[in-house]
Amino acid sequence: MNAPSRPHLPRGPYLLCDDSVLPEISLVDKAARLVAGGARLVQLRMKRTPIREALAATRQVVALCRREGALCLVNDRVDLALLADADGVHVGDEDVPAEDARALLGPGRLVGVTVRDVVGARAAQAAGADYVGLGPVFPTSTKQVPAPVLGLEAFASVVRDSPLPVVGIGGVGLVNIASVAAAGAHCAAVVSDALLAADITERVRRLVEAFEQGRFGA
């Protein structure tokens, strides 16, 4: 029997559906608004949600994304990704090691890893990762203890030498997503700029357009 094919990481905005941002709106509702705006990659980040509620929400968002042709990844929780049949996981320094995530998920799902430099990107590749999240590119308030800001020049340098596709993370929004794309990013992660917009769906549409403009130099 052939191994299941791994999803392809789509280029463009990488939208995070975070339970700590706009908590009065459900994760499923937030994800629906993101996808309606053209998001093709949604990551569920559920640090505050009880496990059973998180599992139910993940299953609903996975189903939503499948219907709309988008991918759904889960932050940190490999168990939730497996139980909900998500498209993959993203792990950080304090999460399940990438090689263990790959062993648990098998070859048919994506594994992303947060790194700080080219050395980390090479280690992630050796561990079986499909892509790396690199940053923070800009100052960010989403993380309680953010790492030192890279800036666009250092970010672009790592992108050039990385053996894996790079997702720009940290402080990315409509005002700067084009510059992240122009620096060579495969994707650009957006959290608050999308979820706190007056119209989430319209903001995502504009983020998609801005990324493409930066990517192609329009």
Swiss-Prot record:
CDD domains for the chain: TMP_TenI (cd00564)
Residues annotated to bind 4-amino-2-methyl-5-(diphosphooxymethyl)pyrimidine:
Q43, L44, R45, M46, K47, N75, T114, K143
Q: Where does 2-[(2R,5Z)-2-carboxy-4-methylthiazol-5(2H)-ylidene]ethyl phosphate bind?
A: T140, S141, T142, G171, V191, S192
The enzyme's main class, written as a single word, is: transferase
Positions of Mg(2+) binding: D76, D95
Q: What is its EC number?
A: 2.5.1.3
Q: Which Gene3D superfamilies match?
A: Aldolase class I
**Pfam family membership, one:** TMP-TENI
- State the Gene Ontology BP annotations: thiamine biosynthetic process; thiamine diphosphate biosynthetic process
Q: Which GO terms describe its molecular function?
A: magnesium ion binding; thiamine-phosphate diphosphorylase activity
Catalytic activity reported: 2-[(2R,5Z)-2-carboxy-4-methylthiazol-5(2H)-ylidene]ethyl phosphate + 4-amino-2-methyl-5-(diphosphooxymethyl)pyrimidine + 2 H(+) = thiamine phosphate + CO2 + diphosphate; 2-(2-carboxy-4-methylthiazol-5-yl)ethyl phosphate + 4-amino-2-methyl-5-(diphosphooxymethyl)pyrimidine + 2 H(+) = thiamine phosphate + CO2 + diphosphate; 4-methyl-5-(2-phosphooxyethyl)-thiazole + 4-amino-2-methyl-5-(diphosphooxymethyl)pyrimidine + H(+) = thiamine phosphate + diphosphate
InterPro entries with a match to the protein in the record:
Aldolase_TIM, ThiamineP_synth_sf, ThiamineP_synth_TenI, TMP_synthase
| UniProt record similarity statement | Belongs to the thiamine-phosphate synthase family.
Protein's name in the database = Thiamine-phosphate synthase
- Which source organism? Myxococcus xanthus (strain DK1622)
